[in-house]
């Protein structure tokens, strides 16, 4: 029995459904952070994700944000008639990748307007080499933060997140949560979902300890046939100066050579976050496009 509903029916996105399409997600070339096992499953409640199988080559997803319903697809292009059906209940089509856009130009000629760049949701791409060395004048300040951490906290250890250490990651997450003004608008619940997942050892992860005290952690997964590491979560205690910079640096160093890029996800239009992400000098972006209902 298929764990995914058949179009026009949709079903809530379950762990079994995401597991059944995990291989398909890993084959996507653009490395878009939302189109990964972790992002779909961990944020399924936040976005109220639903899934449907249009045919053997195409999957459909529905979601909600800020009171508006959206859809996105994976696989072969949909008939225009089906897209119009989706727009009857959705405000926009999101997560259109650059490759989908270039490979389906004929499809988009059926609309009054072309898809537009969704800049607030561009994923930031950095080379593994850049983040694992922090060499060069542009990243000199970042390297100083790392060196400062090493000088201040020489008695540190790094471990993987597993059944024994994930309780320590939860402690860091809860301390981080106390510093958030609007916790329900953050990725706190999604991070809890991640740490509760029995298969957490299937992910790339690190947890940082100073004198046995857990101070930072990160969780990521491979995408784009193993060439991109998508960092879903990075949390640290701000009272341990340089812990954010060090976990970032140490994680990049821990990655296998097959990883070319590290995707540190989007800034969501937050100017402070944008400045922070730009300060690490991205190599480029995993661009995303959207098409609003008015383009019909």
What does each of the following model-derived ranges do?
Residues 94, 159, 261-264:
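Short catalytic-loop micro-motif centered on adjacent basic/acidic residues
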Residues 23, 29, 33-103, 209-238:
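Conserved donor-binding loop and adjoining core beta-sheet/short helix segment
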Residues 83-88, 149, 248-256:
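A conserved short alpha-helix in the GNAT/GCN5 acetyltransferase fold that borders
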Residues 110-182:
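Acyltransferase donor/substrate-recognition loop-hinge adjacent to the catalytic core
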Residues 205-294:
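Aromatic (often tryptophan-rich) hydrophobic motifs at membrane interfaces
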Residues 6-35:
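Short Lys/Arg-enriched alpha/beta "domain-start" segment
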Residues 163, 167-230:
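A mid-sequence, solvent-exposed acidic-amphipathic segment
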Residues 102-116, 144, 268-285:
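Conserved active-site alpha-helix within GNAT-family acetyltransferase domains
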